[in-house]
Regions:
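Long cytosolic regulatory regions associated with cyclic-nucleotide signaling
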Residues: 1-17, 139, 143, 162, ...
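Cyclic nucleotide-binding regulatory module and flanking cytosolic helices
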Residues: 1-49, 92-94, 99
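Cyclic nucleotide-binding regulatory domains
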Residues: 26, 51-111
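Residues that recognize and position ribonucleotide moieties
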Residues: 45, 64, 86, 107, ...
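Cyclic-nucleotide recognition modules
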Residues: 86-145, 149
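Polybasic "coupling" helices that flank or enter modular domains
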Residues: 131-202
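Phosphate-/nucleic-acid-contacting segments
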Residues: 172-262
């Protein structure tokens, strides 16, 4: 099991044009003055793989968004083994508000770059601005969806079903990001190393590789490189997943560009 390693916080304020733009895109429904206030509360933080943001039974001290990397929602089984119950990836929100202790460990499964806020300051902001309460509802629903998605994903009996379901989860989340149109080709990077992804999906690296190439041969995805893919046949990918994951919350089934499309 990875041990916690010191994070390397950056100075107060976003300090990054891309993070600033992301924050404003994610919170575009809020009035300008409120976005400015949140922008002043935000900070960037880099954490190493294995760093725990919170342990089961502890209270979150920060909330925020993942700019890159992946965080795993983990439970420790009675025999000491770790069980992943959910995965948070780029642009997902983490942390709990107006709630008690966490029901799971939240651990970096890869080096992660975070845009975060002090929890107490963020709660105070939400309490003072009713318009921001929609953020709470979205956060609660996202966490419920994440747990449901992972449960459905791991119910797949075949490796290719679990891999297809995981790629669909990444695809659906990518469509929700600011500026992402539903009718354009979406290029998505795997959030963790293949060897780690195989472990989280309950298989071996070679089986994961075979499943990815099977999905490419079936016309569901195009492998840009070993860690990046494009969905080119959404119906084929949904069929391969063999479960009802899908595109609720993404505005229906989008048109996806074929191999020669733009």
């Amino acid at each position: 099991m990875a041990m916690d390693r010191p994070a390397s916080p950056r100075p107060s304020g976003t300090g990054s044009a891309s993070a600033h733009a992301l924050l404003r895109g994610l919170l575009k429904t809020l009035p300008e003055a409120q976005r400015d206030e949140l922008d002043g509360l935000a900070r960037l933080r880099d954490i190493a793989e294995g760093t725990a943001l919170v342990r089961e039974g502890e209270r979150y001290r920060t909330v925020g968004y993942i700019l890159s990397g992946a965080l795993g929602m983990q439970k420790t089984l009675p025999d000491g083994r770790l069980h992943v119950i959910g995965l948070l990836v780029q642009h997902d929100m983490f942390g709990r508000l107006f709630d008690g202790p966490s029901g799971f460990d939240l651990v970096a499964l890869a080096p992660a770059h975070l845009l975060e806020f002090d929890r107490d300051a963020f709660e105070s902001f939400v309490a003072r601005h009713p318009e921001a309460q929609q953020l709470l509802l979205t956060r609660i629903l996202d966490e419920i969806d994440t747990a449901r998605e992972w449960l459905l994903l791991m119910s797949g009996h075949k490796v290719v079903e679990r891999v297809a379901a995981f790629l669909l989860i990444l695809f659906r989340r990518a469509l929700r990001q600011p500026g992402q149109a539903g009718d354009r080709r979406v290029r998505i990077a795997l959030p963790v190393r293949r060897v780690d992804l195989a472990h989280y999906l309950g298989t071996r690296p070679e089986s994961l590789s075979r499943a990815l190439h099977d999905l490419q041969r079936a016309g569901a995805i195009h492998l840009v490189d070993p860690n990046t893919f494009e969905v080119i046949g959404l119906r084929a990918l949904v069929d391969a997943a063999g479960s009802d994951l899908l595109l609720s919350g993404a505005g229906g089934e989008p048109r996806v560009a074929g191999p020669g499309g733009g």
